Amino acid sequence: FRKVDPDWYLEEMFIKGEADVAILSTQVLMDFYHTGFVNPERNAQLVKRAPERLVPLGGVDPRMPDAVNEVERQVTELGMKGFKWYTAEWRGESRGWRANDPMVFPLYEKCIELGVKNMHFHKGPAVEPLALEKFDVRDIDEPSSLYPELNFIVDHIGLPRLDDFCWIAARSPNVYGSLAVALAFIHKR
């Protein structure tokens, strides 16, 4: 993932594959990777190759001191169309954060100001050593009510917390599920 050749990616995705459009997620994960697992600059470069077929998502850790400015930079300078949030991301002693933490609200408000509506949250299968409780979908409920102008997309439909996701999505018109990874579970082994 970190060293994908752009030519290979575009050929596999759009020439050999059946995709019409792809979402490029930024995956910060700075405590594990010096420049992030997938950084927004790399995604911005790839989008230049196929702007009509690639939708770039930025990524910011809300615990960063300059997080609001970084959201603005990624939108205005790099062309990010939404954000992918990793609530289980480590940062120093912190082992994650919650989408309903008031420290995140200024980032949502900056996105609204910039006209960016789509907030993706990694709420799927947890891998070691990340904490399972930081992938809990229930923290989406409050901000989706407070910010009805934003779309809260629960990536991987909250697996393995599908019941909680369904209850929240059923009553919140701005909560959606992304089936990435989840589709693999429809096939029998």
Language-model region placement:
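Helix-coil boundary/capping segments in enzymes
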Residues: 1-189
